[in-house]
Structure formats: C-alpha cells, structure tokens
C-alpha cells in the first residue's frame, strides 16, 4: 500500500503554511503554531490524513474507478498532468470551466468536437481547407485541447476528485459536492476545508510538496489498478482451469 512518511513531508516543506494574517480559522485544528509570521501545519495530523486519502483512492482505482486530478495553479499544472498520465487517469491543469461536471452533457459535445478536429488534423482535411479556415480550426483545436485534453477520454463523470488547493479550486469542489462525488484536497492554512471529504492539511504552493502529493496519489492509483489486474488474472486463470 502506498504511504507517505513524516520525513517525506518535512523534506518537501508540506508543513509551511501561509502568513498568519491570511489564516482561515477553520484550519485551526491542523495548525501546530507559528514561526516568523508563518503558520506551521501539524504533520501529526497530515500524515495519517493523507495516507487515509491514498488508501481511499487506491480502493476506488481497484474497482476501475476514475480519478480526476485538478490543479490549475501555475505551480501545480505540470505535476498534475504528469502524475495523472503516469497512472492512466484524468486531469484539469489549465482552467476549470464552470459546469465541467454539473453540465457534463454540454462538455461531452465539446469533447466530441475536439476529437473531430483531432481526426481532421491528421487525416488531411486541414490541408484541403483555405489557409484562413485551417488556421481557425487549428486554433479551435488548441483551445479545446488546452481545456479538455485531460478529460477527453474520461467517458463520464469521475469517481473521485483529487485537488491541489481547495481555495483556488472551490468551483470544482462545489460541483463535485452537488453531484455527490467525493473530494480529496490539499488545504492550506488560508483556505476553508468546506466540502472536502478527505482533508490533507498542507502547503499548496511549493513545487516539491505538490510533486509529493501528486506522485503519491498516482502511485496509490497504480497500486489499486494492480490489485484489479491481479484479481482479473486470478479469475481468468480460474475460468481456464475449469
């Protein structure tokens, strides 16, 4: 089972919160104290809470569940995308479009258009168009890929959201809440943990911390999928033996 240690978190700077004047009182139970005007997060809480979240994600992946990685802050985008791809899951790394979950029917139409344009870009259709029309379609393709590329093969709503920065991604969290989709989120000292099912109190800005979260979630998802494949292989073997 994928777990993260206290040492891993200390080395990544997970314990460094925001300046004390920006704190959200709802995060008080998870704050150890302050140093040089900066809140220090109590990792005695974070370690077990994150490991519990990892076990939950692994369990969902073991049942062929879909994990949607969400992190549109500049510091998070790259790690979100790389980690989601490393475990064959899905991501939103650029901008959360309002209604991405709650208006899935419309989003599905946009994904269909994205796939049409992708086909046209490789089957020679673009070459048959005027320069202006080809450029317009190419720009449309780039725009759609940027916003929907990470979910184009999701094939339906996700089974869990993994979010970096609860404050920054509050719209995504609200949509998940409305649909009953569980949320795992990194919540810094300046944020409210409202609507988060699995709170991970921690720094949501430092790239080392973000990479620790995303790579651990990817490892947990891969471990879960490994369990699923092992069970499947066992069942296949059993069927063959009969």
Curated annotation (Swiss-Prot):
One Gene Ontology BP term is: translation
Kindly list the GO CC terms recorded for this protein.
Answer: cytosolic small ribosomal subunit
Q: Which GO terms describe its molecular function?
A: structural constituent of ribosome
State the CDD domains in the record.
Answer: RPS2
Which domain of life does the UniProt lineage start with? Bacteria
Fetch the InterPro entries from UniProt: Ribosomal_uS2, Ribosomal_uS2_bac/mit/plastid, Ribosomal_uS2_CS, Ribosomal_uS2_flav_dom_sf
Keywords attached to this Swiss-Prot or TrEMBL record, sorted alphabetically, are: Ribonucleoprotein, Ribosomal protein
Pfam families assigned to the protein according to its UniProt record, in alphabetical order: Ribosomal_S2
Family in the record? Belongs to the universal ribosomal protein uS2 family.
Q: Which HAMAP family does this chain map to?
A: Ribosomal_uS2_B (MF_00291_B)
* Protein's name in the database: Small ribosomal subunit protein uS2
